Amino acid sequence: MHVIVVGSGIAGLSAALTAAQTGAQVTVVERASEGEHGGNTRYTEAYLRMKSMDEVADDFIDHFMANAGGYTDPGIEQEMVRDHADWSPLARSQSMVDPDLLGAFADHAGSTLRWLEQAGLRFDFLPTAFITTTTTRLLPIGGGLAMVETLTQACKACGVTFRFETTARALLTRDNRVTGLATSNGDVSGDAVILACGGFEGNPEMLARYVGAPAINLRPVARGGHYNKGEGIRMALDIGAAPNGDFGSYHAEPIDPRSGLAEPAIFTFPYGVLVNKQGQRFTDEAPGTVDAHYENVTRRIYEQRDGIAWLIVDARIDDVPNWQKGSRTDQPPIKADSIEALAEKLDLPADALCETMARYNAACVEGAFKPLEKDGLATQGLTPPKSHWARPVDCAPFLAWPIISANVFTFGGLKVDRHARVIDQDGRAIPGLYAAGETMGIYYRTYTGSTSVLRGAVFGRQAALHASGRTQ
């Protein structure tokens, strides 16, 4: 048994190590050089939506199903309450969150983390960048970098062959079965191909085609995303794979565009005012806890002219305990002693910005400010409103940070089943082809936070187990 894995992030490395542990010959094909490999995983803190090492968070299933797709045909939805074996081809290939797959995701999450623990990783409930939270998050000690380095060494110890600086170009097929891979350094034949090579956040043409022309204002959240150019998705679609996930969307994160750090996130906007290039507010900065709502706020930033906004706070930001943990940029705030002076430094229309701030301050009311919980301290008579933590911003000095939407990963990918087998447009598994991580599509509308790394580990492992005949 020869298993070919494309990509070396958490999905690819989980697949490669699992396959090698079953006794398979394994080849990993990776575009990046050694030491630069690992895709997005290398740069992420790798939050995991778990309430313990063995159980997913209480809201795991509910959040996925609340963002399960578009307006699905009720007849197809009714099919999905039956046993998966009784689904029609239409139901099997439908673009939506597959409840059977979601059940497998939740069921295998704990055992996958225990397997990663056996491989040498350690996990704990460590502090996050979120000042206010709704759900629980487990983290690997050392973040995604520890995952990449630990699993790479484990793979090498098991005899896995790595072909770095090698790009996958196309799938090889015979008699409707995938038999190998065409690469930039020649063909590789095998019994199964596992596509774990990310989404298309590093491909401007695909972003413009699917997300839209304004995607020129998006950039990958970290260096690893630039390597994810969508070939894995494209080559599978070319042989009839069914698409899944929202191709027109992506996981949005608010970052400081001046910074070259990985994930230079700005999560402190609930305590200030967001304005666009016209010097106007455009969204509720604080609809709820920041971990649950930052993505929707960031999407509103992306919709503004040139996809940029500025967060403005005043000296009372220091009333928020440890607010700096929500500001991951290495760039200093822009400071001024008046709103007029700040407008000049930000190159914003001073009259408009002064009017915006005056209207906002006038709409703030007296009340208890509780920065570590939803306090209901809301503006009155202001459109758009601010639902929590609304205090006047009128105490110099004033501080500002630019914010854009980063593209953490794209939502569109391939339809897979609970074993990570790629499904074709007729609802059948394509023999010899699997997908995991970003290359598989499961997200619609709003991202179910802290599940992408977990998705990669779970379905990378499930793909390898099935390909090796060891299905759990």
Task: Go through each PLM region and give its residues.
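Conserved N-terminal/central alpha/beta ligand/cofactor-binding core
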Residues: 31-161, 274, 281, 287
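An anion/pyrophosphate-binding glycine-rich loop and adjacent beta-alpha core
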Residues: 225, 233-352
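Short, well-ordered coil/turn residues at beta-beta hairpins
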Residues: 7, 190, 196-197, 277, ...
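N-terminal Rossmann-like FAD-binding beta1-loop-alpha1 element of flavoenzymes
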Residues: 3-27
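Glycine-rich loop(s) and the adjacent beta-strand/alpha-helix scaffold that form part
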Residues: 188-255, 453, 462, 466
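N-terminal leader/propeptide and maturation segments of large enzyme subunits in energy/redox metabolism
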Residues: 75-84, 88-105, 312-314, 321-370
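Helical element adjacent to the flavin cofactor pocket in flavoenzyme catalytic cores
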Residues: 139-191
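A glycine-rich dinucleotide-binding beta-alpha-beta segment and adjacent secondary-structure elements
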Residues: 170, 352-443, 447
